[in-house]
Amino acid sequence: MVVAMDQRSNVNGDSGARKEEGFDPSAQPPFKIGDIRAAIPKHCWVKSPLRSMSYVTRDIFAVAALAMAAVYFDSWFLWPLYWVAQGTLFWAIFVLGHDCGHGSFSDIPLLNSVVGHILHSFILVPYHGWRISHRTHHQNHGHVENDESWVPLPEKLYKNLPHSTRMLRYTVPLPMLAYPIYLWYRSPGKEGSHFNPYSSLFAPSERKLIATSTTCWSIMLATLVYLSFLVDPVTVLKVYGVPYIIFVMWLDAVTYLHHHGHDEKLPWYRGKEWSYLRGGLTTIDRDYGIFNNIHHDIGTHVIHHLFPQIPHYHLVDATRAAKHVLGRYYREPKTSGAIPIHLVESLVASIKKDHYVSDTGDIVFYETDPDLYVYASDKSKIN
């Protein structure tokens, strides 16, 4: 086992601290994934199309009601409240479409595909394109090279990036606006587009699926353009555009926090050290306060990553049942108040210090570029 821990002071967390606590999160777990599966109650695996559709109905009704109320009152005092609320619901709709992509929505593939296309196209997400890349993320979670979402940059790639690109990636809130760019261009060091049927993201057999989803996405975009001419662009921006930006910020923040920002530095793997189980155990549960229910318990992320076929409405029970097997490999999330303000601190702190991982070693930890913000500060002084 090779652990890349050069320049120890630049590594988030300290191996000495882990040894003092008697626990190393990068050590082989003493249990197998079958042990976790056996601990989860049978009812947690049952999918109910009616129950899943009830959440879709709830969210669509809430989105429509909010939009009608905002247009009716048309008050600049209320618009900011509407934007936050509606953007939050757009994120909830995304989560339901995400469930369709995993097949946890129902055991009926056609229903999953139809509902998934409707939900994701509405918020300008190419359903199959994202579904397939997200499947890659789950199949390779925690792998430095093969993971798909918020992948750590190897040191050589990081240091070859223009300084402006590094600043864009590691200056809050800019990373929280990355999702549309990711859909078109993926992450640094990776090629392909979620809209192109011939992208390296997809197998030849998946090209028709990608074309279908890109067509649905295009229809939604054309509808928004048409409404801009039919009504006026400012109204479309207020009713849809700003909530879309809030949704993107929710998506980027939540997906980042599920894989970064824990108080204890967590490992990433390569080569023979990686396994599906070890990669899944590097994910993090989060408590989103009042948003837990609104966002369909997306914060129960560890069990979701290991068993994505479990419906979201059973994830709390499944997590509770699996904790005794996971032991210290499960990191109990900090209890949130009504509004999860504490997560903002975790997000900002992680982005400021989790910059790259070593080019070598099968178990690596994030390291910090001590000159990233110093360079920017010195340059501003010169100017």
UniProtKB/Swiss-Prot annotation:
Catalytic function, reaction form: a (9Z,12Z)-octadecadienoyl-containing glycerolipid + 2 Fe(II)-[cytochrome b5] + O2 + 2 H(+) = (9Z,12Z,15Z)-octadecatrienoyl-containing glycerolipid + 2 Fe(III)-[cytochrome b5] + 2 H2O
Transmembrane segments: 53-73, 210-230, 234-254
Spans annotated as Disordered: 1-28
Localisation per UniProt entry: Endoplasmic reticulum membrane
Molecular-function GO terms, alphabetical: acyl-lipid omega-3 desaturase (cytochrome b5) activity
Protein EC: 1.14.19.25
Keyword set, alphabetical order: Endoplasmic reticulum, Fatty acid biosynthesis, Fatty acid metabolism, Lipid biosynthesis, Lipid metabolism, Membrane, Oxidoreductase, Transmembrane, Transmembrane helix
Annotated membrane topology: Multi-pass membrane protein
Span of the annotated motif Histidine box-1: 98-102
Motif (Histidine box-2): 134-138
Gene Ontology biological-process annotations: unsaturated fatty acid biosynthetic process
Residue runs in coiled coils: none
Pathway recorded for this protein: Lipid metabolism; polyunsaturated fatty acid biosynthesis
Chain ranges for the short sequence motif Histidine box-3 as given in the UniProt record: 301-305
GO cellular component: endoplasmic reticulum membrane
Free-text function comment from the UniProt entry: ER (microsomal) omega-3 fatty acid desaturase introduces the third double bond in the biosynthesis of 18:3 fatty acids, important constituents of plant membranes. It is thought to use cytochrome b5 as an electron donor and to act on fatty acids esterified to phosphatidylcholine and, possibly, other phospholipids.
Family named by the database record: Belongs to the fatty acid desaturase type 1 family.
Domain remark from Swiss-Prot or TrEMBL: The histidine box domains may contain the active site and/or be involved in metal ion binding.
Protein name: Acyl-lipid omega-3 desaturase (cytochrome b5), endoplasmic reticulum
Encoding gene (name): FAD3
